[in-house]
């Protein structure tokens, strides 16, 4: 059950809420939203996890009174993407680390932004860093594996310990469906190997969930070979 927040008494002459990121996040916290589970942009607030964020319709109405110009995005698809991504990031991110971000990658920006509050990380686009974001998506990961097999190179499944992979188990279809719905530029596959793509398209028809299974099998075989 939501509490109805009267925030008028919380503001003084020296405590007006402006349009800065700091003020918006402070206001959200005051009305009971857990900002570790939302992604902030100046124009939109994206809910990553509705339950954990506690960003109810009542709290949204309170928020919109203060910030009518900021849209609250409740996309269930985006929440599913965040859930998939968090399974990787929870294991890969080191608290308080500096993370080098890719340029012009809107979906990665959205996924990584909450970790500045969850783990105290600093997102950088140049200069010194501890970890680097690899924007590898699930489709390219699978196509890389198939390409290596077809070329006789083996699994071609490698990951760098200094890299993190927020999109490694998120499909191109999910990503572009969300980006299109949100009015953003779509992304493309990096791996354009024709044989790998054709085989992936064939498997799409007969076993739509194959991608996760291919990656899981490759991880198992890689670990097995490393221990022998």
What does each model-found stretch correspond to?
Residues 220-228:
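C-terminal catalytic and target-recognition region of SAM-dependent MTase-like enzymes
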Residues 1-2, 16-183:
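ATP-dependent adenylation/nucleotidyltransferase module used to activate substrates
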Residues 2-10, 35, 171-216:
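Mid-to-C-terminal catalytic subdomains of enzymes
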Residues 142-147, 212-213, 217-220:
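A short, terminal or domain-edge coil/loop segment
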Residues 8, 12-18:
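Surface-exposed, low-hydrophobicity interaction/linker segments
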Residues 82, 124-129, 204-216, 226:
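Short secondary-structure transition/capping segments
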